[in-house]
Curated annotation (Swiss-Prot):
Keywords: Cell inner membrane, Cell membrane, Ion transport, Membrane, Plasmid, Potassium, Potassium transport, Symport, Transmembrane, Transmembrane helix, Transport
InterPro entries: K+_transporter (IPR003855), K_trans_C (IPR053952), K_trans_N (IPR053951), Kup (IPR023051)
Originating organism: Rhizobium johnstonii (strain DSM 114642 / LMG 32736 / 3841) (Rhizobium leguminosarum bv. viciae)
Protein name: Probable potassium transport system protein Kup 3
HAMAP family: Kup
Molecular function GO labels: potassium ion transmembrane transporter activity; symporter activity
Length: 633
C-alpha cells in the first residue's frame, strides 16, 4: 500500500505505523504545546494586575484560578480535544482544512464559508506575529527578578534571541528538532513540580476547582471582570495549535500528551502560583519566577527562554504551513518555498514570510517594550479564530457527521457563548494594543480577497479571448503544419480552452511538435491525493493529448515527479527532448475593470512579485520556454 493511499484511508494509522506512540507524544510536546505551555509565565500575573490593585485578595485569587481552570477545561479539553480534533480533513487540521471540509458538506460550496476560512487564516497570521514577541519577552523578563540592575537589557536580549531565531530558519530545524520534545517535556515537569510544592503554601486554593468561585467573581466584580477575562484567556492561547498540527502527529498522540502531562502540569502550576501569592502578596508582580528559590531562578530563566523559543518556532512553522496551504488553494500568490530537509516534506523555509514575520515581531518588541503591554495585543486574533472554528465545527457536525440539530446545538451553543465572552473581553483591549493583530489580519484578508478576485477576473478575460481546444485540434488535423521531433507540454489553467502558449507558438514558430500535451494542474479540496487518483490522461489523436494532474493542498506540486506516474499510464515522452511552454502575462490596470483601480494595482503588484511557475512546479529550467503577452483587467 502506498503512503498516499494509507494517508487517505486511515490517517491515524499512518502516524502509528511510522513511529511508536511514545515518540510521537514526545515530539508533539515540542511542537503542539509550546505556546500554551509558556502561558504560565504571564497569564496569572496579568489576571492579577487586571483586578485593579486588589489582586492578592483571597476571593480574587480563587476567582481567577477558577476561571483559568474552567477555561482550560472547556476551551481546550472539551472543545478542541473532544470535538475539534475529530473534525480532520483526511488527517489534516487547521482553519483552511476545516473550511474546505465544511464547504464539502454544503450544497453549492457557498462563498461565505470561504470568507470565514480566509478571516480565520488571517487571524492566525495576526496572532503569529505576537506569540514570539510576548513569549520570548516574558521569559527574558525573569532577569528583572534575578538581577534588577539588568532590567534595561531585557529588550536588547529579546531582540537578539528573536533575530537569531529568524536567521537560522533558512538552515532548517531538523537538526535541533529532536531536542524540542525533551526540553518541552522537562519544562512541563518543572511547571508541575514547582507548582505542586507551592500548593502547600496555602492548600485552600484547590477549592478553585469549584466553578462557583468563577461565577461569584464575575458577579461581584462587574467593573473589572471584562479585563480579567481578557487576561484569563491568555491561559488558553495556543489551544488552536492542537488542531493546526493534527496532520503532523495524529489525534491520539496529541490527546495523550494533553491528559498525561500538559493539562496536569498547567493546573498544578497555576494553583501553585495562586497559593504562593496568597502566602506572599508582595510577590504578585512576578509570581512565576519569584516562587522559585534564588539558586533556581537563573536556570529557570534559561529553561523558560528555551521553551519560548521552541514555542515561537512552532508558530513560525505553522505560519509557513498556512501560507503554503493558502497558496495551493489560490488564496495567495505563489511564494518561494525552500525545502530544508531531504526526508521531511513539511520542513520548509519561505524567505518572504520569514522576513515579514521578523520585521513585525521586532517592531512589536520595540513598540511595547514589555510583556504586560503586549498582553493587551494578544488574544483578540486567537479568540476571533476560535469563534470561527466553532461556526465551522457546527457545519461539520450537521453536514459531515450528520448530527441532529438539537445535539449539535447542545454542544456548540455553550462553547460559542464562551468564545463570544472571551472575544468581547479581548475587543475591550482594542485601543490598548488589540488593534495590532486586527490590522495585520485585515491586511492579510484584503490581500487574499484581492488575489482571488483578481484571478477570477483574469480567468474571465483570458477565457473570453481563448479558442476551444477541440476547434484548434480539428483545424490542425485539416491544415497540418510542419512537425518537429520531441514533446511539447503546454501549461494552462483552463482545461477546455486552447493554451495561449500553444497559439503563440503556432503563430511565431509555425511548427508543431510530434507530441503535444495540454497540461493542467488542479488543486484538490483534500490535503493529499493518492497516486492512483492523481493523473487523468486523455488522447485526442496521435499528436494531441490532455493531462490533468491533481495535487492535494498540502502537497508540493512537483510536475516532473507526477509525470513519472503519467508514464505508467501510457504517456510516452523523453524528458530530455520535452519542452514546457508557459505563458507569462503582463497585467495592465483598467479604470473600467471589475476591481477598483487601487485594487487593480495591488493585484498587479502581487502577481509581479509571485514566484515563477518554473520554480513553483519544479520544472527543469533548461527545458522551459516562456511566451509573454499582455492582459488588461
Amino acid at each position: 500500500m502506498t503512503d498516499s493511499k494509507l494517508r487517505s484511508a486511515d490517517p491515524e494509522l499512518e502516524h502509528q505505523t511510522r513511529q511508536g506512540l511514545p515518540s510521537l507524544v514526545l515530539a508533539a510536546l515540542g511542537v503542539v504545546y509550546g505556546d500554551i505551555g509558556t502561558s504560565p509565565l504571564y497569564a496569572f500575573r496579568e489576571a492579577l494586575h487586571a483586578t485593579g490593585g486588589s489582586g492578592a485578595d483571597r476571593a480574587n485569587v480563587l476567582g481567577i484560578l477558577s476561571l483559568i481552570v474552567w477555561a482550560l477545561t472547556i476551551v481546550v479539553t472539551l472543545k478542541y480535544v473532544t470535538f475539534v480534533l475529530k473534525a480532520d480533513n483526511r488527517g489534516e487540521g487547521g482553519t483552511l482544512s476545516l473550511m474546505t471540509l465544511a464547504r464539502e458538506g454544503l450544497t453549492g460550496r457557498p462563498k461565505w464559508v470561504l470568507v470565514l476560512g480566509v478571516i480565520g487564516a488571517s487571524l492566525f497570521l495576526g496572532d503569529a506575529i505576537i506569540t514570539p514577541a510576548i513569549s520570548v519577552l516574558s521569559a527574558v523578563e525573569g532577569i528583572e527578578v534575578v538581577a534588577p540592575a539588568l532590567s534595561n537589557w531585557v529588550v536588547p536580549i529579546t531582540l537578539t534571541i528573536i533575530a537569531v531565531l529568524f536567521f537560522v530558519q533558512r538552515f532548517g530545524t531538523s537538526g535541533v528538532a529532536s531536542v524540542f520534545g525533551p526540553v518541552t517535556a522537562l519544562w512541563f515537569i518543572v511547571l508541575g513540580v514547582s507548582g505542586a510544592i507551592h500548593i502547600f503554601d496555602d492548600p485552600s486554593v484547590l477549592a478553585a476547582v469549584n466553578p462557583v468561585h468563577a461565577l461569584q467573581y464575575i458577579a461581584n466584580n462587574i467593573g473589572s471582570a471584562i479585563a480579567v477575562l481578557g487576561a484569563v484567556f491568555l491561559a488558553v492561547t495556543g489551544a488552536e495549535a492542537l488542531y493546526v498540527d493534527l496532520g503532523h502527529f495524529g489525534r491520539r498522540p496529541i490527546v495523550t500528551a494533553w491528559f498525561s502531562l500538559v493539562f496536569p502540569s498547567l493546573l498544578l502550576n497555576y494553583f501553585g502560583q495562586g497559593a504562593f501569592v496568597l502566602a506572599n502578596p508582595e510577590m504578585a508582580e512576578h509570581p512565576f519566577f519569584s516562587m522559585h528559590p534564588e539558586w533556581a531562578r537563573i536556570p529557570m530563566v534559561c529553561l523558560a527562554t528555551a521553551a519560548t523559543v521552541i514555542a515561537s518556532q512552532a508558530v513560525i512553522s505553522g505560519a509557513y504551513s498556512l501560507v503554503r496551504q493558502a497558496m495551493h488553494l489560490n488564496l495567495l500568490p505563489r511564494l518561494r518555498i525552500l525545502h530544508t530537509s531531504e526526508t521531511q516534506s513539511g520542513q520548509i523555509f519561505m524567505p518572504q514570510v520569514n522576513n515579514l514575520l521578523f520585521i513585525f515581531v521586532a517592531a512589536l518588541v520595540l513598540f511595547f517594550q514589555n510583556s504586560s503591554g503586549l498582553s493587551a495585543a494578544y488574544g483578540i486574533a486567537v479568540t476571533g479564530e476560535m469563534f470561527i472554528t466553532s461556526i465551522l465545527l457546527f457545519i461539520v457536525m450537521r453536514r459531515i457527521w450528520s448530527w441532529k440539530l438539537t445535539a449539535a446545538l447542545a454542544v456548540i451553543v455553550p462553547i460559542t457563548l464562551i468564545d463570544a465572552g472571551f472575544l468581547a473581553a479581548n475587543i475591550a483591549k482594542f485601543a490598548e494594543g488589540g488593534w495590532v493583530p486586527v490590522a495585520v489580519a485585515s491586511t492579510m484578508a484584503l490581500i487574499m480577497q484581492t488575489w482571488t478576485a483578481g484571478r477570477r477576473l483574469l480567468a474571465a478575460r483570458t477565457k473570453a479571448d481563448e479558442i476551444p481546444l477541440s476547434a484548434i485540434i480539428d483545424n490542425l488535423a485539416r491544415k497540418k503544419p510542419p512537425t518537429v521531433p520531441g514533446t511539447a507540454m503546454f501549461l494552462t489553467s483552463d482545461i477546455e480552452g486552447a493554451p495561449t502558449a500553444l497559439l503563440h507558438s503556432l503563430k511565431h514558430y509555425k511548427v508543431l511538435h510530434e507530441q503535444n500535451v495540454i497540461l493542467s494542474v488542479v488543486t484538490s479540496t483534500t490535503p493529499f491525493v493518492p497516486d492512483d487518483e492523481k493523473i487523468f490522461l486523455e488522447s485526442f489523436n496521435r499528436h494531441f493529448s490532455r493531462l490533468v494532474i491533481t495535487f492535494g493542498y498540502m502537497e508540493t506540486p512537483n510536475i516532473p515527479r507526477a509525470l513519472v506516474l503519467a508514464r505508467k499510464l501510457g504517456l510516452k515522452f523523453d524528458i530530455m527532448s520535452t519542452s514546457f511552454f508557459l505563458s507569462r502575462r503582463t497585467i495592465l490596470p483598467s479604470k473600467k475593470g471589475g476591481l477598483p483601480f487601487w485594487q487593480d494595482r495591488l493585484f498587479i503588484s502581487l502577481a509581479e512579485n509571485a514566484s515563477n511557475a518554473t520554480d513553483y512546479f519544479g520544472l527543469p529550467s533548461g527545458r522551459v520556454v516562456e511566451l509573454g503577452l499582455q492582459t488588461t483587467i
